[in-house]
């Protein structure tokens, strides 16, 4: 179970300032045939793991499968990740740190759809094959953040847009690739999988879950996590 980051980065060809809305931001997508081109130590380590798994099949005949998925969202995600981080910060009135201009584009998939894809691939996938898992649901970070702000404010009973003042642009992080976008048509055509949840419904479910499980979030974000957060953003 790997990541789309192993493929490197794609060009962003839609005009600057164009809103996301879940549509594609370019004509190119990562396919199972895309050559690996990791740009960070993290993605290089994931690429190495993928090759290690394939080598075990080639050398020892071990039955293997590799999946590469786009960004996940949903319940129980560790709060350092963008969506739970911003939900929690809005709830607590803390700044919403946006790397650079927020123009980086990611494809988002609800976690239960990812789990369902893994189940289908595990039981019906071709041994030693690779399958990409994605939502065809691209969002610029800044546009996604505005959706989160609007949803959280509405569910908390805040005036519309009240928390937008918390958006704070910070220095971009090293090795921050501009665009990832998965082509998962192979998985759809061969095994019949496709996302079942529309993004708007998934975000609503996700925000509601974190707001209804504040103790879970507070327990995790206390202690050492708070030290990590301060080292990253304060």
Residue ranges of each PLM-predicted region?
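Hydrophobic alpha-helix immediately C-terminal to the catalytic Tyr-X-X-X-Lys motif of short-chain
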Residues: 48, 52, 56, 86, ...
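Active-site proximal helix/loop that lines the substrate pocket
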Residues: 3-8, 71-77, 103, 123, ...
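C-terminal substrate-binding subdomain of Rossmann-fold SDR/epimerase-dehydratase oxidoreductases
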Residues: 18, 84, 90-234
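Glycine- and small-residue beta-turn/loop positions that connect adjacent beta-strands
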Residues: 1-2, 99
């Amino acid at each position: 179970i790997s990541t789309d980051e192993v493929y490197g980065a794609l060009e962003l060809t839609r005009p600057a300032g164009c809103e996301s809305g879940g549509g594609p931001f370019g004509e190119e997508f990562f396919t199972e045939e895309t050559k690996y081109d990791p740009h960070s130590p993290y993605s290089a380590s994931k690429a190495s793991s993928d090759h290690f798994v394939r080598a075990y099949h080639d050398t020892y005949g071990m039955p293997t499968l590799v999946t590469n998925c786009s960004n996940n969202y949903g319940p129980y995600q560790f709060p350092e990740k963008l969506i739970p981080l911003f939900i929690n910060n809005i709830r607590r009135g803390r700044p919403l740190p946006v790397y650079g201009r927020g123009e980086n584009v990611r494809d988002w998939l609800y976690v239960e759809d990812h789990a369902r894809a893994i189940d289908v691939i595990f039981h019906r996938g071709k041994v030693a094959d690779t399958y990409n898992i994605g939502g065809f649901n691209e969002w610029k970070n800044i546009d996604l953040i505005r959706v989160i702000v609007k949803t959280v404010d509405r569910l908390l009973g805040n005036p519309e847009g009240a928390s937008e003042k918390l958006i704070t642009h910070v220095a971009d992080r090293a090795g921050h690739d501009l665009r990832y976008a998965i082509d998962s048509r192979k998985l759809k055509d061969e095994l019949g999988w496709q996302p079942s949840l529309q993004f708007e419904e998934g975000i609503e479910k996700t925000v509601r879950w974190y707001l209804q499980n504040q103790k879970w979030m507070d327990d995790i974000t206390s202690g050492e996590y708070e030290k990590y957060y301060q080292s990253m953003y304060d």
